[in-house]
Amino acid sequence: MARIAGINIPDHKHTVIALTSIYGIGKTRSQHICAATGIAEHVKISELSEEQIDTLREAVTKFVVEGDLRREVTLSIKRLMDLGTYRGLRHRRGLPVRGQRTKTNARTRKGPRKPIKK
């Protein structure tokens, strides 16, 4: 198994799909990485040489991925909550942040129903 950005990349998958197992790299970004490194998208990771895997590693290090990206996201949410913005309050209360209705929907964000005690 190849190890890129601290993640074991599955050997049996094609390069484009295997790179998406890294948090922060989707299909489009993995296609751009393959084009920039000159590696064909349909080639499996197990068929790549060590030099090609090293070029993939170098290309991935140019992006914010994995732990750094997770930390960046949590810090930006924490910053919104500390500033007391509307979005921060919605995060703090566990409600939808982007303007969705909450009267009937939003069960995923709000959690299971709480019974009304009589």
Swiss-Prot record:
Which GO terms of the molecular function aspect are on file?
rRNA binding; structural constituent of ribosome; tRNA binding
Q: Keywords, A to Z?
A: Ribonucleoprotein, Ribosomal protein, RNA-binding, rRNA-binding, tRNA-binding
What InterPro entries does the record tag this protein with?
Answer: Rbsml_uS13_C, Ribosomal_uS13, Ribosomal_uS13-like_H2TH, Ribosomal_uS13_bac-type, Ribosomal_uS13_CS
Could you tell me what this protein is called?
Answer: Small ribosomal subunit protein uS13
Q: Whose protein is this, by species?
A: Sodalis glossinidius (strain morsitans)
Q: Which PANTHER family match?
A: 30S RIBOSOMAL PROTEIN S13/40S RIBOSOMAL PROTEIN S18, SMALL RIBOSOMAL SUBUNIT PROTEIN US13M
Region of interest: Disordered: 91-118
Q: Which gene encodes it?
A: rpsM
Output a single Gene Ontology CC term carried by this record: cytosol
A Pfam family annotated for this chain is: Ribosomal_S13
Q: Does the keyword rRNA-binding apply?
A: yes
**Which residue spans adopt a coiled-coil conformation according to this UniProt entry?**
none
Q: How does it assemble?
A: Part of the 30S ribosomal subunit. Forms a loose heterodimer with protein S19. Forms two bridges to the 50S subunit in the 70S ribosome.
Listed under GO biological process in this entry are: translation
Q: Does the keyword RNA-binding apply?
A: yes
Protein function: Located at the top of the head of the 30S subunit, it contacts several helices of the 16S rRNA. In the 70S ribosome it contacts the 23S rRNA (bridge B1a) and protein L5 of the 50S subunit (bridge B1b), connecting the 2 subunits; these bridges are implicated in subunit movement. Contacts the tRNAs in the A and P-sites.
Upper lineage ranks?
Bacteria, Pseudomonadati, Pseudomonadota, Gammaproteobacteria, Enterobacterales
